[in-house]
């Protein structure tokens, strides 16, 4: 039995989960998420819990069981608590600022880099060098944060670049002179 898949998902009182076959809609105080999950899985919904049940013990069903449960749990957590990723800009003159809902990064290029806020994503800039990406979809928040980091990933010699908060950047020693 999948250790992740057999866990029962607790649903907070302010969140509603509705199933239409394999299509799931989760509504909560932070927003609403929809997704089509694996059609082979069945869902047992009771008052405050949902259990994902797999049809057989085949290898494919065992792997999909845990994945389906994790996706559904992430949706429930997203609409109730939300997700947030924090990025730090490290480097002389590196800064971020808001322009409406969009994010503008000055990270050593000849031009500022503009990142559009997708629907359901909000940016917050603190102290010009810290960017917070938040939203209800864990997948979307992670993808946007990764796109921001890829604008100027941290380099190993001086450590300059955009990094996740708490990310360890392995440093290298420079060339030694003759």
Curated annotation (Swiss-Prot):
Keyword Nuclease among UniProt keywords: no
Recorded superkingdom: Bacteria
Keywords of the record: Ribonucleoprotein, Ribosomal protein, RNA-binding, rRNA-binding
GO BP field: cytoplasmic translation
UniProt keyword Ribosomal protein, yes or no: yes
SUPFAM superfamilies: Ribosomal protein L6
GO molecular function terms listed in the Swiss-Prot or TrEMBL record: rRNA binding; structural constituent of ribosome
Pfam families the record matches: Ribosomal_L6
GO cellular component, one term: cytosolic large ribosomal subunit
Gene3D superfamilies found in the cross-reference section: Ribosomal protein L6, alpha-beta domain
Summary of subunit composition and partner proteins: Part of the 50S ribosomal subunit.
Family: Belongs to the universal ribosomal protein uL6 family.
Function (record text): This protein binds to the 23S rRNA, and is important in its secondary structure. It is located near the subunit interface in the base of the L7/L12 stalk, and near the tRNA binding site of the peptidyltransferase center.
Protein name: Large ribosomal subunit protein uL6
The species this protein was found in: Staphylococcus epidermidis (strain ATCC 35984 / DSM 28319 / BCRC 17069 / CCUG 31568 / BM 3577 / RP62A)
């Amino acid at each position: 039995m999948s250790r992740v898949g057999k866990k029962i998902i607790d649903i907070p009182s302010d969140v509603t989960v509705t199933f239409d076959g394999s299509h799931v809609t989760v509504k909560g105080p932070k927003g609403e998420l929809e997704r089509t999950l694996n059609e082979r899985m069945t869902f047992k919904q009771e008052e405050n819990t949902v259990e994902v049940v797999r049809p057989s013990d085949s290898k494919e069903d065992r792997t999909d069981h845990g994945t389906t449960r994790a996706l559904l749990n992430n949706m429930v957590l997203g609409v109730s608590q939300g997700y947030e990723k924090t990025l730090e800009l490290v480097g002389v003159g590196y800064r971020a600022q808001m322009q409406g809902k969009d994010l503008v990064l000055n990270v050593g290029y000849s031009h500022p880099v503009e990142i559009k806020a997708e629907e359901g994503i909000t940016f917050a800039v603190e102290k010009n060098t810290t960017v917070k990406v938040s939203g209800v979809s864990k997948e979307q928040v992670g993808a946007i944060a990764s796109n921001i980091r890829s604008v100027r990933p941290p380099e190993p010699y001086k450590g300059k670049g955009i990094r996740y908060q708490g990310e360890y950047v392995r440093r290298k020693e420079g060339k030694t002179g003759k």
